[in-house]
Amino acid sequence: MLTINSIKNGIVIDHIKAGHGIKIYNYLKLGEAEFPTALIMNAISKKNKAKDIIKIENVMDLDLAVLGFLDPNITVNIIEDEKIRQKIQLKLPSEVNNIIKCSNPRCVTSVESYIPHKFKLVDEEKGEYKCEYCDEIYKGAKALEI
């Protein structure tokens, strides 16, 4: 059995769907980080057969809306002095800005690059978002192709 050490201070992104941890790790550009990170894949899970986990040492600035958009079943644990100080259960954010890019060629964001890409959650069950400008529908993180 593999033993993974705890972190003293930082963030643990837990309950990532098995096999998706590397996609989130890459999306967050953690491979380029100048602080310690760890990606654990196919860890044993009580809820499911397996899960992925990402540990980030000494970093507290993380966009939870992006993580909730990528995988709404993630739990973020805030670690201080090697203890879990806070558990945050993520969910789909009600709106996302500049995470999804609208691909509708008639959308104003295709022509005017300074306009932010804004999407509102329209169906939580299906994970569908609608562009605020052209009403194009996107299905959750699949729009990011991760």
Curated annotation (Swiss-Prot):
Alphabetically ordered keywords of this record: Metal-binding, Pyrimidine biosynthesis, Zinc
Annotated GO MF terms: metal ion binding
SUPFAM superfamilies with a match to the protein in the record: Aspartate carbamoyltransferase, Regulatory-chain, C-terminal domain (SSF57825), Aspartate carbamoyltransferase, Regulatory-chain, N-terminal domain (SSF54893)
Entry note: cofactor: Binds 1 zinc ion per subunit.
GO CC, alphabetical: aspartate carbamoyltransferase complex
Cofactor(s) essential for the protein: Zn(2+)
GO biological process: 'de novo' pyrimidine nucleobase biosynthetic process; pyrimidine nucleotide biosynthetic process
Gene3D superfamilies recorded: Aspartate carbamoyltransferase regulatory subunit, C-terminal domain (2.30.30.20), Aspartate carbamoyltransferase regulatory subunit, N-terminal domain (3.30.70.140)
Positions annotated to bind Zn(2+): 102, 107, 131, 134
Family, per entry: Belongs to the PyrI family.
Subunit structure: Contains catalytic and regulatory chains.
Job of this protein: Involved in allosteric regulation of aspartate carbamoyltransferase.
Protein name as catalogued: Aspartate carbamoyltransferase regulatory chain
Highest classification ranks of the organism: Bacteria, Bacillati, Bacillota, Clostridia, Eubacteriales
Gene field: pyrI
